[in-house]
Amino acid sequence: MNATTAPLPYSTTRLHELAHLLIANIRELAHAGWTPATSSNFSHRLDEQHAAITVSGRDKGRLVEENIMVVDFDGLAVGRPLRPSAETLLHTQLYRRFPEIGCVLHTHSPVQTIASRLYAGSGVIRLEGYELLKAFDGNTTHETAVEVPVFANTQDMQVLAAQVDALLDKQSMWGYLIEGHGLYAWGRNMAEARRHLEAFEFLLHCELELLKLRGTR
């Protein structure tokens, strides 16, 4: 480090570890077809002020360590002048609000996108009576219901983040859908966030299949 280079305000060792964790998991999700056409974004809490997050516009199945950048909880790049996803604020608002959240995953599977369109009018999908509801942290029985919010899509992330915050003031959430877009899910760590993501995917798929079998919407 020369005299004009300031030290980085985060651990590069920890960033290296998280980059490998993110890349390995993202590659699996990409191979499942949940991140088409460079879509989707993924992050992990780095420390009390920073998050590691995927850069914008990269094929998520072919990420390398240089494609993982650092942002502060205002969504601003730290360390390297890279461009984070336009949806970075939807990640950082969760880290800022909930110190226990360690990982946020955003995917665009066909199931998630179709469900978000079908239920956009009601603004919510009610998942009830499924054994897999126990996959969500804190749930211990199938005799419960989880409501998945469906927010209108917008390119104004400040507006969308405010809408998410307002709903978080009223209810517990493990994730939400954006109309015609995809799913956000989170957890205390990568394993929990993936469990929540996979549970949502399975349960939404079940709901769509039930609609087809019933011949109703």
UniProtKB/Swiss-Prot annotation:
State what protein this is by name. Methylthioribulose-1-phosphate dehydratase
Q: Top EC class per UniProt?
A: lyase
SMART domains of this UniProt entry?
Answer: Aldolase_II
Task: Please give the organism.
Answer: Xanthomonas euvesicatoria pv. vesicatoria (strain 85-10) (Xanthomonas campestris pv. vesicatoria)
Q: By its UniProt entry, which Pfam families does this protein fall under?
A: Aldolase_II
Q: What is its EC number?
A: 4.2.1.109
List the molecular function annotations (GO) for this entry. Answer: methylthioribulose 1-phosphate dehydratase activity; zinc ion binding
Question: What does UniProt give as the signal peptide span?
Answer: none
Q: Any stretches that span the bilayer, and where are they?
A: none
